[in-house]
């Protein structure tokens, strides 16, 4: 059986790695080739006591208050591949395999945990605490793609806010976390936390010792102890992307901007911009998180596949965010194949309006190339305006309409 298509790359730059006094976050979501990724916004909400929330496969107790979030997600599920909340927290996840067996039973997906961390955490560390507590209570498991063929994995996460970043790596309910306060860091479908463990599951070392994976003597390396003896080919291939991502970050260390992060996500030579027969980059995100709390965070999302052929469009949280139905997939209600048992017995069309327009326009013809050049020029102009706004040189106008206006303009250009 062919190796299942699943890989991702997450990046962060903190001062002095960044050119300005900003934290810069980036992620490519690499998924099955025809999977549609939508961008959805959910406002902050209050919830009645004892209420529950229905995640992709299971329901769990809801909290009293959830943060406003913007999410980029495979259109069939509840959670998200990546996203941000109103407090300037960004989270992205990655598939990983470890010595701990993967749970095929339905539990929380790593993508559910991304959304739950954003909805419930007002800092990167708070989101990490949310995720690890839910892991302990409900575990992780279930099908991670829209198919009846079983495919599950464990997860690693990059959690970022205006001040710091956390790498969280899991093995079943066990986990280790590393705090990053300066410079650049990337993760790619493999364990990376060695001896520098900032926080960990209380039973991490005792379980490792009981399983015979660690002698109990000497330094404890999470990567060495928990990496599988025979990793899937996908994890082995990720090493090339990890090295390529590290090299690109180091090349720009001290001068990382949102534009630099976008160029890294568009890099095909390293495999970071994925495009092959079975899978590709289906959505991308770059965020600017200024250290100054009086400045707004800006989140750029594509809502379309292949960042080298897509436009990053800015989203800023405000009191009145305009809904953007053009990047939201059709709803199928109780008859959705993810909701009917047994699951995934038939396929539905999840393409949203922008996805269709992007698909039609992205040809190899001269007209297609010319259109791409125009769109890239408009993107660079938008970036310059955002940077000027962050420097205080121009006033931000109607921030809640910004993402809508950019999506609307992109569709009109394609037509």
From Swiss-Prot:
A GO biological process held by the record: proteolysis
Active site: 8
One of the record's GO molecular function terms: dipeptidase activity
Gene name per UniProt: scrn2
A Pfam family that the UniProt record links to this protein: Peptidase_C69
Family assignment from sequence similarity: Belongs to the peptidase C69 family. Secernin subfamily.
The name this protein goes by in its record: Secernin-2
């Amino acid at each position: 059986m062919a190796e299942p298509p699943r890989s991702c790359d997450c990046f962060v730059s903190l001062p002095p790695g960044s050119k300005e006094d900003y934290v810069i976050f980036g992620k490519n979501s690499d998924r099955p080739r025809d999977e549609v990724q939508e961008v959805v916004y959910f406002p902050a909400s209050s919830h009645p006591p004892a209420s529950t929330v229905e995640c992709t496969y299971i329901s769990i107790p809801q909290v009293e208050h959830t943060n406003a979030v913007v999410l980029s997600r495979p259109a069939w599920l509840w959670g998200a591949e990546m996203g941000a909340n109103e407090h300037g927290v960004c989270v992205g996840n990655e598939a990983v395999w470890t010595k701990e067996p993967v749970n095929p039973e339905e539990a929380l997906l790593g993508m559910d945990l991304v959304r739950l961390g954003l909805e419930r955490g007002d800092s990167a560390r708070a989101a990490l605490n949310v995720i690890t507590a839910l892991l302990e209570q409900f575990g992780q498991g279930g099908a991670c793609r829209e198919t009846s063929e079983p495919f599950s994995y464990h997860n690693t996460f990059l959690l970022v806010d205006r001040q710091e970043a956390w790498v969280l790596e899991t093995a079943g309910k066990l986990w280790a976390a590393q705090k990053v306060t300066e410079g650049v860091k990337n993760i790619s479908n493999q364990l990376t936390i060695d001896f520098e463990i900032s926080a960990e599951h209380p039973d991490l070392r005792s379980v490792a010792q009981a399983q015979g994976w660690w002698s109990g003597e000497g330094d404890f390396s999470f990567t060495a102890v928990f990496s599988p003896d025979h990793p899937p080919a996908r994890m082995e291939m990720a090493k090339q992307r990890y090295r390529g991502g590290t090299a690109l970050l180091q090349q720009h260390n001290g001068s990382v901007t949102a534009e630099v992060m976008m160029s890294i996500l568009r890099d095909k030579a390293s495999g970071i911009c994925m495009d092959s027969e079975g899978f590709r980059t289906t959505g991308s995100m770059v965020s600017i998180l200024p250290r100054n709390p009086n400045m707004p965070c800006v989140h750029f999302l594509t809502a379309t596949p292949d960042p080298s052929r897509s436009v990053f469009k800015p989203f800023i949280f405000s009191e009145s965010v305009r809904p953007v139905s053009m990047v939201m997939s059709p709803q199928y209600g109780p008859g959705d194949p993810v909701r009917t048992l047994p699951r995934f017995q038939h396929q539905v069309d999840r393409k949203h309006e922008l996805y269709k327009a992007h698909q039609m326009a992205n040809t190899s013809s001269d007209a297609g190339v010319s259109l791409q050049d125009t769109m890239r020029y408009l993107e660079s102009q938008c970036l310059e305006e955002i940077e000027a706004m962050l420097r205080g040189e121009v006033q931000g106008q109607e921030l809640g309409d910004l993402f809508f206006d950019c999506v609307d303009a992109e569709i009109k250009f394609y037509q």
